[in-house]
Regions:
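Structure-specific nucleic-acid interaction/processing domains
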Residues: 2-113
Length: 113
């Protein structure tokens, strides 16, 4: 009886890939974050409380978020990745509560400290 073929090898992990990403929620608000492993299922550490305020229980039953890679590097240091993330937060104004869910750096017009 012929031997069954070996299963395909899993896709290689981009374990060394640093990325800065943008999450877009159904209401159009965004969150900018970084991931130093480029995990396929990591969607950031935005405040659950802040996001939940913007959605009704019915809206929370089914929704879609989008994750876009804005920048990537195999060689950037942690501080370089953090600097790029900071620059994208300011560029996209995702720290403005009307625009996004980033809490840092504090938005100048928000009164937050």
């Amino acid at each position: 009886m012929p031997r069954e073929p070996d299963p395909p090898s899993p896709a290689p992990q981009d374990a060394a890939m640093n990325v800065v990403y943008r999450i877009t929620y159904p209401n159009g608000k965004i969150y900018i974050g970084q991931d130093r492993t480029n995990s396929i299922n990591y969607f950031g550490s935005a405040s659950d409380e802040l996001i939940a305020r913007d959605f009704t229980p019915e809206q929370r039953r089914s929704f879609t978020v989008t994750r876009d890679i804005l920048w990537e590097s195999e060689t950037a240091s942690r501080s370089e990745v953090t600097q790029v993330e900071f620059e994208f937060i300011l560029r996209y104004r995702s720290n403005d509560p009307a625009v996004g869910y980033n809490r840092n750096p504090p938005f100048a017009g928000s009164g937050r400290v």
